[in-house]
UniProtKB/Swiss-Prot annotation:
SUPFAM superfamilies: ArfGap/RecO-like zinc finger, Nucleic acid-binding proteins. NCBIfam families: reco. Belongs to the RecO family. This is DNA repair protein RecO. Keywords: DNA damage, DNA recombination, DNA repair. Transmembrane segments: none annotated. The gene is recO. One of its GO terms (cellular component) is bacterial nucleoid. One of its GO terms (biological process) is DNA recombination. Involved in DNA repair and RecF pathway recombination.
């Protein structure tokens, strides 16, 4: 087994036998790996194997079975996310989405950095719903999906009030709406924002300001895209959907919602 030191993000853990755990960690240097932790509740590793824990790990990598954690340091627990059920539910969802998008043992430092940066921005207080939307749109490529929100699929003009066509996996300008009678009939701001989401770099993102009604439209359409093109159904996503109903009782009203 190869011994390495790597940054890692705990995706989840689950019980194994009486007091052991299997811990799924997305590592920067070795991709996603499953680690075996014996007597987990009494182990010195217990603080490092909780979901949404980001740390430096010293590990032994086994390409033919379970890997092992030797030690850890510099733990970042994402306290703000863990202290808010709404942020936590969305963070848990993007962890599950990243897990679904990448096979185990595949080296993907770009996705690792993107996932960690998304969580950092959530932790800093940026809009977790919109950050999740951006993550979902940019992650489509990992599922082998390429969608065009930038230019008309026929005339290639840009900057127009586009609508989306599932038939052409891209947008249509008003002149070519008739090419697909079953187009999505979207608010033109939805494909406009998704085009921005595809291109944006989180290193440049400082503020997010999107009204609640537009966020609902984005959520609805991105759900349709994932159903049509990806077809995965994650438990963490269902929990988010449930939050949109009963969770509103607990959620503090934002300034935008109060002025609507």
């Amino acid at each position: 087994m190869e011994r390495i030191e790597t940054r890692g993000l705990v995706l989840y853990n689950r019980n194994f036998r009486e007091d052991d755990k299997l811990v799924k960690i997305f590592t920067e240097k070795a991709g996603k790996r499953m680690f075996f932790v014996k007597h987990a509740s009494k182990s010195k590793l217990v603080a490092s194997i909780q979901p949404l824990t980001y740390a430096d790990f010293i590990v032994k990598i086994n390409d033919d079975g379970l890997s092992y954690i030797e030690d850890f340091h510099q733990v970042q627990p994402f306290k703000n996310i863990n202290g808010d059920i709404f942020k936590l539910s969305y963070a848990t969802y993007i962890l599950a989405l990243a897990d679904a998008a990448l096979q185990d043992k595949v080296y993907d430092p770009a996705l690792f950095a993107f996932l960690v940066k998304t969580l950092d921005l959530m932790e800093s207080g940026l809009d977790y719903e919109v950050l999740t939307n951006i993550f979902e749109i940019q992650l489509l490529g990992r599922f082998g999906i390429s969608l065009n929100f930038h230019e008309c699929a026929f005339c290639h003009r840009v900057g127009l009030p586009f609508d989306y066509s599932y038939k052409y996996s891209g947008v249509l300008c008003p002149q070519h709406y008739q090419q697909d009678e079953r187009r999505a009939y979207l608010d033109p701001n939805v494909p406009y924002l998704l085009d921005q989401f595809q291109a944006i770099s989180f290193d440049e993102l400082e503020t997010i300001s999107i009204k609640p009604e537009m966020k609902r439209k984005l959520r609805f359409f991105i759900d349709q895209l994932y159903e049509e093109y990806v077809g995965i159904h994650l438990k963490s996503k269902k929990f988010i959907d449930d939050l949109s109903s009963w969770g509103q009782i607990m959620k503090p009203r934002t300034e935008n919602e109060e002025t609507e």
